[in-house]
Design a protein with these regions (language model features):
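Active-site beta3 strand of CheY-like receiver
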Residues: 45-51
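Acidic catalytic/metal-coordinating carboxylates
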Residues: 34-37, 60-63
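Short, conserved "switch-loop" micro-motifs in signal-transduction and mechanochemical regulators
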Residues: 83-84
């Protein structure tokens, strides 16, 4: 199973995502609550998958996604955001995200996207 970095500014959402991942046998190796921290933690941990919110303080998730992809073009990033507008989904995919999960979500949808991102 995969080593995962979970990034969201809401502690509750980090727990929801972490619990869903753990229930499927994945290991949450780190968490971050800002886009800036996400980039630093990615460099430090080199996870197999990163889940990333868009709306966060200091640096938004799309900026963090672009920076992570510049560091590691093979990075596997899954966007988990309440901003489900088509334009945000398209921008995320163009920047390199493997999939986009709209919050609120069912654990099954998250795990389906995780499987797709890791395939």
């Amino acid at each position: 199973m995969a080593r995962v970095l979970v990034v969201d500014d809401a502690a509750f959402m980090r727990k929801v995502v972490s619990d869903a991942l753990a229930s499927a046998g994945h290991e949450v190796v780190g968490e971050a609550n800002t886009g800036a921290e996400a980039v630093l933690r990615y460099q430090e941990l080199r996870p197999e998958l990163t889940t990333l919110d868009i709306t966060m303080p200091e640096k938004d998730g799309l900026t963090a996604l672009a920076e992570i992809m510049a560091i590691d073009p093979s990075a596997r990033v899954l966007i988990c955001s309440a901003l489900g507008q088509e334009s945000k989904v398209i921008e995320s995919i163009k920047l390199g995200a493997k999939d986009f999960v709209v919050k609120p979500f069912q654990s099954e949808r998250l795990l389906e996207a995780v499987g797709k991102a890791l395939a």
